[in-house]
Each structure stands twice: as C-alpha cells, then as structure tokens.
Curated annotation (Swiss-Prot):
In this organism most lipid A is tetraacylated without a phosphate group at the 4'-position and a phosphoethanolamine residue at the 1-position. It comes from Helicobacter pylori (strain J99 / ATCC 700824). The chain crosses the membrane at residues 143-165. SUPFAM superfamilies: Acid phosphatase/Vanadium-dependent haloperoxidase. This is Lipid A 4'-phosphatase. It holds the Pfam family PAP2. It comes from the Bacteria. GO terms for biological process: lipid A biosynthetic process; lipopolysaccharide biosynthetic process; response to antibiotic; symbiont-mediated evasion of host innate immune response. It is a single-pass membrane protein. Removes the 4'-phosphate group from tetra- and hexaacylated lipid A species, has no 1-phosphatase or Kdo hydrolase activity. Absence of the 4'-phosphate group renders the bacteria resistant to host-derived cationic antimicrobial peptides (CAMP), allowing it to camouflage itself from the host innate immune response, and plays a critical role in the long-term colonization of the host's stomach. Its main location: membrane.
Length: 198
C-alpha cells in the first residue's frame, strides 16, 4: 500500500508542473490521444453491441449522456458565476482566460466507459479501460487544458453515474440461433439450434 501511495504521489508531482502549455511534440501527441480517448464510450458500446448486450449498451448511453449533461451544466454555471463576480478560481483553465474548466468533459467521457465496464463486466476487463481513462486525464493536464482537480472531479462524476446506472452483466444460459449449412451433395440445409449451459 505504501508503494502504491508513493507511486501515486510521484505521478502527481510529475504531472503537476506540466499544467501549462505543452512543451514538446510528445505533449501535443498526448493531447491528441486524449482527444480521441474521450470517445471511449463509443468504443466500449461497440463491444457491448457485438456481445449483443443491448441492456448494457442502453445503460452506457444513459450514464454517459447524464454525465456529460451534468458536466456541461456545471461548466456553464461556473462560467456564469465568474461573470457575476463570484470567486471560482478552481474553474479557470490553466491555459487561457476561460472559466469553463471545471469539471473536465474529456475525463467524464473516458471514465463513463471505465466505470461502466467495471460495474457491468467486472474489474479484470475494466483494467485496460481504466488505464486509458487515466491516460486521458493525464493528457488534459499535460496539455494545460485542466488542472488535476478538474480532471479528478470529472472522473468522479462519471464514475458515480456509472455506479448508479449500470447493472451487473448476466449472460443468458440458453441461446436460440439459426443454422445454415450445406451437406456433402451441396444442398442447402436450414435449421434452428438451441443450446443450454448447466
């Protein structure tokens, strides 16, 4: 546990000084990777669709849409509050004079997918998705678009809605499927197959 805390603290200390503008080509590439990974719910949804997990696909869609709605509502509220004279320094983007930095929408998108996979399919399939979501958060901080607090809040909002909207996946024990084949003479054969797992 101490090693994990030390690793986490080292990561924070490494990322925190880089919250200004990207300093090299690698930072720009990382920013572009984060821009793509914010669409993780689409990639995860495609996998759910391929598994014919339509309920899971619906839960992912609802969780992601609610997450993005709340995040963009908060961004607008903090921006309006700043215009009205409120002290909302935590909502300012590090890169520029924008007050729509809190919370991070990219982080919300990526962690919507990570939380969904965790609660729907379990922790083992969720590990790579969580790693990609953390990479998305890191890319936003390195690019100077968000602070660590902003990406953390966006991630927590997404994880919370994934918890609320996602149910555990229970594969069907039985399956009914069409069978289309040909026999040794070349004649087509059609049928219906049924399988049941004990």
């Amino acid at each position: 546990m101490k090693k994990l805390k030390g690793l986490f603290l080292s990561l924070l200390l490494w990322v925190y000084p880089l919250k200004s503008e990207p300093i090299n080509e690698g930072a720009y590439i990382l920013e572009e990777i984060g821009d793509v990974l914010r669409f993780l719910p689409i990639f995860v949804g495609t996998v759910s669709l391929a598994m014919r997990d339509y309920r899971g696909l619906g839960e992912l869609a609802v969780g992601t849409l609610v997450t993005q709605g709340v995040i963009y509502g908060l961004k607008g509220a903090f921006s309006t509050a700043h215009k009205d004279g409120a002290r909302v320094g935590f909502a300012k983007r590090p890169c520029c004079n924008s007050w729509r930095g809190m919370p991070s929408g990219h982080a919300g998108g990526a962690f919507s997918a990570a939380g969904f996979v965790y609660y729907r399919y379990g922790w083992k399939p969720a590990l790579p998705v969580i790693a990609l979501a953390i990479l998305t958060d890191t890319s936003r901080v390195v690019a100077g678009q968000h602070t660590i607090l902003q990406v953390t809040i966006g991630s927590l909002i997404a994880w919370g809605f994934a918890y609320l909207f996602t149910s555990r996946y229970k594969p069907k024990r039985w399956m009914l499927y069409p069978e289309i084949s040909s026999d040794f003479k070349g004649s087509s054969r059609y049928g219906v197959g049924f399988s049941y797992q004990w």
